[in-house]
C-alpha cells in the first residue's frame, strides 16, 4: 500500500512538473470524473441490493397476499427501469442519428445489448416468483404479469431495431436525412419521450389517474407517425430522394410506432396486475 501511494505521488508530481497549469487542471478534471463515476456506481449498487432484498423477502414468505404485494412492488421497480431505459435510449438514438454522432449510437447499442441480458434475468426471476403464489392468484393475475414482461422485452428490442440501422447508416457514411425529415422526426420524438416519462411516473407510483388521456395521446402520436410514413412512401414513388435514406427513415417511424404501442400496452396490463380485487 505504501509503495502504491509513493508511486502515485511520484507520478502526479512528475505530471505537474512537466505539464504545469494544464496538467493540474487535467488532474482536477480526472478527480471530479472519478468521484462522479464512483457515486453513480454506488447508487446503482444500492438500487440492485434493494431489488434483491425484495426478491429475497418474497422467496422466504409463506403468506400468499404478502408474496403478491412484494411481487407487485418488484414489478413496479423493474418495469419502471425498462421504461426509463426506453426513454433514455430512444431519445439518445434519435438525437445521435440526426446529428450523425457515431459514438452516441454505439453507446446506445451497447446499452441495448446489456439491457437484453437484464430482461432475461428479470423473466427468470419472475417465473420463480410466480411459482410462490397459489393457483387461484396465478390464474387471476399471471397472464397480466407475463404480458407485462413481454411488452417490456419488446420495448428493449424495438430500441435495438431502431438503433442498429441508424448505426450502420452513419458508420458507412451514407447520406443523412434531409432537413424536412429531421424536423418532422425531431418533433414527434419529443412528444414520444414525454409520453414515456408520464407512463413511467404513473407506473412507479401505481397511480393510473387520467390514463385514458395517455391512451388518446398515444393514438394521436401513432396517427402522426402513420402520416409521416405515407409522406415518405410518396417521396419514394416520386423518386425525389435516396432509397437508403428512405429505408432507414421508414424503419425509424415503424419502431417509434412500436415503442408507443408497447408502452401503452405495458401500462394497461400493469394496471390490471396491480389492481386490488
Identify what each model region corresponds to.
Residues 26-38:
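Hydrophobic core of alpha-helical transmembrane segments in multi-pass integral membrane proteins
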Residues 10, 22-28, 107-110:
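Composition- and surface-driven signal marking solvent-exposed, interaction-prone regions
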Residues 2, 33-35, 181-185:
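Short, conserved aromatic-histidine micro-motifs
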Amino acid at each position: 500500500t505504501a509503495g502504491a501511494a509513493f508511486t502515485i505521488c511520484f507520478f502526479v508530481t512528475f505530471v505537474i512538473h512537466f505539464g504545469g497549469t494544464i496538467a493540474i487542471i487535467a488532474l482536477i478534471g480526472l478527480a471530479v470524473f472519478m468521484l462522479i463515476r464512483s457515486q453513480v456506481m454506488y447508487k446503482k449498487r444500492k438500487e440492485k441490493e434493494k431489488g434483491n432484498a425484495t426478491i429475497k423477502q418474497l422467496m422466504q414468505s409463506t403468506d400468499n397476499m404478502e408474496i403478491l404485494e412484494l411481487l407487485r412492488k418488484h414489478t413496479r421497480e423493474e418495469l419502471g427501469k425498462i421504461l426509463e431505459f426506453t426513454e433514455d435510449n430512444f431519445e439518445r438514438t434519435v438525437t445521435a442519428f440526426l446529428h450523425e454522432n457515431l459514438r452516441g449510437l454505439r453507446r446506445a447499442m451497447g446499452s441495448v445489448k446489456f439491457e437484453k441480458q437484464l430482461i432475461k434475468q428479470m423473466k427468470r426471476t419472475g417465473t420463480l416468483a410466480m411459482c410462490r403464489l397459489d393457483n387461484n392468484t396465478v390464474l387471476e393475475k399471471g397472464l397480466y404479469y407475463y404480458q407485462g414482461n413481454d411488452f417490456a422485452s419488446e420495448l428493449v428490442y424495438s430500441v435495438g431495431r431502431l438503433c442498429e440501422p441508424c448505426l450502420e447508416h452513419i458508420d458507412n457514411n451514407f447520406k443523412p436525412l434531409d432537413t424536412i425529415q429531421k424536423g418532422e422526426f425531431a418533433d414527434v420524438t419529443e412528444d414520444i419521450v414525454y409520453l414515456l416519462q408520464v407512463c413511467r411516473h404513473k407506473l412507479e407510483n401505481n397511480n393510473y389517474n387520467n390514463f385514458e388521456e395517455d391512451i388518446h395521446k398515444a393514438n394521436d402520436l401513432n396517427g402522426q407517425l402513420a402520416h409521416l410514413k405515407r409522406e415518405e412512401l410518396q417521396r419514394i414513388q416520386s423518386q425525389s430522394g435516396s432509397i437508403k435514406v428512405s429505408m432507414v427513415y421508414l424503419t425509424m417511424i415503424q419502431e417509434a410506432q412500436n415503442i408507443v404501442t408497447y408502452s401503452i400496452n405495458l401500462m394497461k396490463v400493469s394496471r390490471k396486475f396491480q389492481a386490488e380485487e
